Each structure stands twice: as C-alpha cells, then as structure tokens.
Amino acid sequence: MKREKYLSILLVMCILSYFMMINMSITADAEDLANYQAKTEVLRRDGFIYDLLNSYLKEKELIEYTHRLTNLDYDDCEFILNECKINNIDPFIVLGVIKRESDFNPNAQGAAGERGLGQLMENTARPVAENLGYVYDPDKLFDSRYNLKLTITQIAYLINLYDNDLHMALTAYNRGQQGLIEYMEKSENNSSAVSDYSAKVMQFANEYKENFH
C-alpha cells in the first residue's frame, strides 16, 4: 500500500516537473521570440533609415550633377528633380529636352517665338499655364522656374497621353500632337514615331544617365 502511495506521489511529481519544464520552455521561446522581433524591428527601422539616407544622398548627388552639367542655379536644379518626382518622369529625359531645345540657356529665343529653357511657344505655354492656375505671361517664359514648371508639366502630359512611348511624346513635344500624326503617316518605318529630335533627346538622356552612374 505504501509502495503504491510512493509511486503515486512520484508520478505526480514527474507530471508536475514535466509541465514546469514545458512552461519554462514556452517562456524561453516567448522571450526568444520577443528578442527576435525586437532585433528584427531594429534592423527594419535601421534599414528604412538607411534607405532614406541613401535616397537623400543620391538626390543630392543628382542635384549637384545637374548643377555642374547645366550651370543652372542649384535651386533650379533641385526644382527640376522635385518636379520630375511629382510628375513621375525620368529627370534625364527632361535634361535631354532642355539640352536639345536651349542648350540650358534660360534666355534662349527661337526664330518662331520659342522662349526659355524648354523653348515654349504661346500656343503650348498658355493652356499649360492656365491649367496650372498660373497667369500666363510670355515674358515669364524667360524665368527658369516658371518655364521649367510648364515644360516638365507638358512633357509629363505627353508621356501619359502616349502610354509611356517616349518617342511619340518627344516628337509631339517638338512638332505638336497634330504634327506627330502627320509625321507618323509619312513615316516609311511602320508609322514609327522615332524622329531626329526624339533620337537626339534620348541620346542626351542616356549619356547623362550613364555619366551620372
């Protein structure tokens, strides 16, 4: 009888010990999980901060590169990058257009009345300005910031209009939308929108991008 009692007590103690071990294991696992999650959160946060810092430094490099390339004011170069981010377009395409149009000269004026960095004409500049809620002033087309805003807005509009077909957008920027249609109708290469203008802009854009990277 005593033997059975001792065995029962021993069995109970073994069971209690087993559950205590499980509980300790669960507690340890929970602590390990908490520590792991904490470390992961730190890594995630540090990674996010690193990405932000890296992105910021990259943008600063691009602004400085644009400043050296164009000789435009630093603030104007920063404005170009910010407007490209807002409009979700490649800044090197914009730089290619400005190079082709005015050779980065804010005071450039074409024989047909084109003005400023993007060589905008009134029939393009006026509706773009009015759509932006700006008062149209032809003399302000020589103002770098005003001209850049209109130029980048127009480029972004055309890229969206032609479903990201850069040659169509660039040829339309140069010739107008009707001019693009007429050009493509006369094209011998399957109604291609590739023009000397679009090819030159793309050449500049690719060169600038390659030199930057």
Regions from the PLM with identified roles:
Residues 1-75, 208-213:
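N-terminal secretory targeting signals
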Residues 46-213:
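Catalytic glycan-binding domains that act on GlcNAc-containing polysaccharides
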